[in-house]
A protein has these predicted regions:
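Sec-dependent N-terminal signal peptides
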Residues: 3-13
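N-terminal "domain-start" segment that seeds a small globular fold
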Residues: 14-38
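Short pre-active-site segment immediately N-terminal to redox-active cysteine/selenocysteine motifs
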Residues: 43-45, 49-53, 119
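Hydrophobic beta-strand anchors of alpha/beta hydrolase catalytic cores
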Residues: 46-47, 78, 123
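Conserved redox-active cysteine motifs that mediate thiol-disulfide chemistry
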Residues: 49-66
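Thiol-based oxidoreductase modules, predominantly thioredoxin-like and allied folds used
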Residues: 75-88, 100-109
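Short, internal strand/loop/helix patches
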Residues: 92-129
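Thiol-/selenol-based redox modules, centered on thioredoxin-like
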Residues: 125-159
Length: 159
């Protein structure tokens, strides 16, 4: 157990990131505009890493559309971060095909590495101040309900 704690401490020291920190973003949207994490500091963000070839990612799109519709007026931003999915034009076709109603950013391998993503989908719930609240890897039957609960908790705590 002591060895595990030491390894974790060394990892945090080596990466310079605390467990609740989230890497900064500066990535293009599909329309070419750049979205920066500084613009999101007062929002609650649901950031989903996905890929066009990931069937589990596709299965989550309807839930993210619902979250966007339900919470966007309350300061919540749903963002799909497309990685390993080809050119922006390929992603744009996919977005239209699957009727994605939330912001889509085009990421790259550096983004995947910065966030420590090793599988898809990978979803982060980020609170105000760009602080990590919770991270979900993969899919589960309760993921959408869990994210809703996270959002509600963060909304109640928001000044």
């Amino acid at each position: 157990m002591k060895a595990l704690i030491l390894i974790c401490l060394l990892f945090v020291t080596a990466t310079g990131q605390q467990p609740d920190s989230v890497p900064q973003l500066s990535l293009p949207e599909l329309d070419g505009r750049t979205l920066r994490s500084e613009e999101l500091k007062d929002k609650i963000v649901v950031l989903d890493f996905w890929a066009t070839w990931c069937e589990n990612c596709v299965s989550e799109i309807p839930e993210f559309n619902k979250l966007e519709k339900e919470y966007s007026s309350r300061g919540v931003k749903v963002i799909g971060l497309a990685v390993q999915s080809g050119w922006a034009s390929d992603i744009q076709k996919f977005v239209r095909q699957y009727n994605m109603r939330y912001t889509v950013l085009v990421g790259n391998d550096d983004t995947v590495s910065d966030f420590g993503v090793i599988s898809f989908p990978n979803t982060y719930v980020i609170g105000p101040g760009w602080k990590l609240y919770k991270k979900y890897s993969g899919v589960s039957e309760t993921k959408a309900a869990d994210i809703r609960r996270d959002i509600e908790t963060l909304l109640k705590a928001k000044p």
